[in-house]
């Protein structure tokens, strides 16, 4: 379990915060102490976050990076991110040794996003992320990194006309048979 973040709750004018990885950050991280930091525009968290709801009031956030999401069990809800409509950069890394399922639909309203990096990996047989169609609304995206196990369909990316760079890794390249929906993207990396 990570160090409690409650001592930060009175720093209401804080605009940038980086919570580095420490030996205390090996388990799930309770980010409840961040709820009152409504002036934050830039947040980087290097510990396992399973509940994103404490972030829902941080509506000034323009850059959010969540790393080290190891050993998350079952499904993880991104629902707490849907009110962060000023986000321009979003990075989320979630990994699990068992089956992990993440619904991407809460991201559909984040239409100011220009950079999105989703690394969602699971040892389960189903897709690690569902509802890739939610990304089709993100028409300002210029850079997209998808390291998501077992995705098969890139057609939701067809309308992302501003996309300049796309990096896709599915854990098994044969899962994607049709790359034509991203023919318009100048730089595509299949890995």
What are these regions (language model features)?
Residues 1-7, 13-33, 39-54, 60-80, ...:
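Concave beta-strand-loop units of leucine-rich repeat
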């Amino acid at each position: 379990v990570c160090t409690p973040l409650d001592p930060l709750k009175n720093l209401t004018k804080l605009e940038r915060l980086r919570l580095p990885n420490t030996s205390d950050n090996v388990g799930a991280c309770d980010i409840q102490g961040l709820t009152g930091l409504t002036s934050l525009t830039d947040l980087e968290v290097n510990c396992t976050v399973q509940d994103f709801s404490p972030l829902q009031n941080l509506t000034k956030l323009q850059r959010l990076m969540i790393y080290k999401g190891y050993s998350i069990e079952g499904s993880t809800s991104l629902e707490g991110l849907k009110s962060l409509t000023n986000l321009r950069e979003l990075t989320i890394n979630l990994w699990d040794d068992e089956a992990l399922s993440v619904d991407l639909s809460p991201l559909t309203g984040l239409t100011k996003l220009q950079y999105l990096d989703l690394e969602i990996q699971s040892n389960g047989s189903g897709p690690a992320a569902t509802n890739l169609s939610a990304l089709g609304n993100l028409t300002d995206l210029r850079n997209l990194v998808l390291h998501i196990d077992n995705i098969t369909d890139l057609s939701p990316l067809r309308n992302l006309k501003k996309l300049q760079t796309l990096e896709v890794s599915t854990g098994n390249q044969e899962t994607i048979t049709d790359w034509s929906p991203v023919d318009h993207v100048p730089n595509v990396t299949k890995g």
